[in-house]
């Protein structure tokens, strides 16, 4: 029997709390490489085994985003179950919909409960923010759309950072999906929440429809500042 970890360690680690972040993850990578045999019985290099373990760890604690749109509640629940979501974080500023009352705050939790999916409304991550007079317009000048610009300004606040930290904390013990009303992520403020999660080292996927899940990527314009703040400066005129 070979000394050190084997591929079965993946099954053990993906059930552990998600604590390998930043430097801690790099330390884990260093230690596991040292004690993994140079070649496994399957012919994989130690580096390949480490990459597999790290990938599975990230996947096990990934965040998802979803928009409810006009979907029937059954279809919506199926989308969450397909990726094994256990917590739905509602980031609508007003958790109600006249056109789709099945997504109202007084109805949605009951619809999710039989499937062991918890519900939480995170008001401080909600969209539809007003102009932030404390932030100069050029700081987030990339956003020509006023709603996105205002939200990018709001995301620089302590209130947003605190709410984001709470979301990440919940994501360490539950597989979390962030929900708003807009069906597609690129027309919703959850794209900015996604940027902040990715900048913090999280893994994020967008749920688009049945069998349609895509990996998220940080907006290429976003620049990370102190205290984990992102700015979106206007692109230089060509």
For the regions a protein language model found, what residue spans apply to each?
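Basic polycationic patches enriched in arginine
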Residues: 21-23, 29-30, 34, 39, ...
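Charged/polar low-complexity intrinsically disordered segments
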Residues: 11, 26-28, 42
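Extreme N-terminal basic, low-complexity initiation segments
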Residues: 1-12
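Residues lining hydrophobic/aromatic ligand-binding pockets adjacent to catalytic sites
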Residues: 53-238
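Residues marking helix boundaries in flexible regions
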Residues: 10-13, 33, 54
């Amino acid at each position: 029997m070979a000394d050190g970890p084997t591929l079965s360690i993946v099954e053990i680690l993906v059930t552990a709390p998600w604590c390998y972040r930043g430097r801690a993850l790099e330390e884990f990578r260093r230690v596991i490489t040292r004690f993994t045999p140079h070649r496994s019985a399957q012919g994989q290099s130690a580096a390949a085994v480490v990459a597999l373990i790290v990938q599975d760890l990230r996947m096990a604690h990934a965040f998802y985003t979803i928009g409810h749109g006009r979907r029937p509640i059954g279809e919506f629940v199926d989308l969450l179950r397909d990726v094994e979501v256990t917590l739905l974080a509602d980031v609508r500023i007003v958790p109600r919909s006249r056109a789709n009352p099945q997504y109202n705050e007084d109805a949605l939790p009951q619809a999710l409960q039989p499937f062991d999916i918890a519900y939480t409304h995170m008001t401080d991550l909600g969209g539809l923010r007003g102009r932030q007079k404390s932030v100069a317009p050029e700081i987030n000048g990339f956003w020509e759309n006023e709603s996105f610009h205002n939200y990018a300004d709001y995301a620089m606040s302590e209130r947003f950072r605190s709410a984001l930290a709470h979301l990440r904390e919940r994501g360490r013990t539950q597989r979390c999906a962030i929900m708003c009303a807009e069906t597609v992520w690129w027309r919703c403020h959850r794209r900015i929440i996604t940027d902040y999660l990715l900048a913090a080292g999280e893994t994020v996927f967008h749920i688009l429809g049945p069998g349609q899940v895509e990996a998220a990527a940080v907006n290429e314009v976003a620049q990370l500042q102190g205290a984990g703040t992102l700015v979106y400066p206007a692109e230089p005129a060509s």
